[in-house]
Amino acid sequence: VLKDNKGKMLLLDAGIPIMKIKKGCSWKVSDIVGCVITHKHRDHSEAVSDLEEMGIPVYKPYEDNSYIGGYGEFKIVSVPMNDVHGRFKHTDADGTECPCYGFIIEHPEMGRMLYITDTEFVRWRFKDINHILVSCNYQKKYISEDVTGKRLHVIKGHMELETCAGFIEANTTNALQNVIICHLSANNAAPKEMVTRIKKVAGMANVDVAE
């Protein structure tokens, strides 16, 4: 959740039950100005229908990528997480492409934030970004060779630490204040090691792990 000084909130994905969202917002659902959804998978979109039934606008660029401008004082621009051929690397269970989008979110109190999750890489470069919230799912050294398909599931459509570090380095400027990594694999990531690695390429920015 992004919350401004007036108490207005923008939800970043909605992959938990609606009651947890309400509780997390201290039941002040009327202060939710909107929600952005990166892709259709349930762990990012579970509460979409509930939010829409409550009259809360939900931006789903994977269904309709028309420019919306933003919600409240939050200006929003979507960015497709595809390769140079237009293909999305994130997939559904059957292996078909799952369109996934990142977002540039701007607010007078915050500046410009980049939110990206569930992608193997980001081919874009961005200017004047103040905050980056990005998924850094796993470290190659912790991925064990197996034949169960779990290894492929972890790798497919998710970002490895060194790839993430390269992305951060390419987008680090004097404007960057914070880097927050999220969506860490429970069994294939060491948070402290990840933070240490990202700090080496993030300039003077603060680096932390999302709770």
Enumerate the language-model features and the residues they cover.
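Conserved catalytic scaffold of divalent metal-dependent phosphoesterases
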Residues: 69-83, 111-113, 119-121, 128-150
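Conserved beta-strand hairpin/beta-sheet module of binuclear metal-dependent hydrolase folds
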Residues: 1-25, 99-118, 131
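Active-site metal-binding motif and surrounding structural segment of the metallo-beta-lactamase
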Residues: 8, 17-61
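A general structural motif
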Residues: 7, 29-32, 55, 110, ...
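Glycine/Thr-rich phosphate-binding loops of Rossmann-like dinucleotide-binding domains
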Residues: 20, 45-46, 123, 141-142, ...
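Metallo-beta-lactamase
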Residues: 50-110
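Active-site metal-binding loops of divalent metal-dependent hydrolases
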Residues: 14-16, 40, 63, 81-83, ...
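Cap/insert and terminal regions of metallo-dependent hydrolase folds
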Residues: 126-210
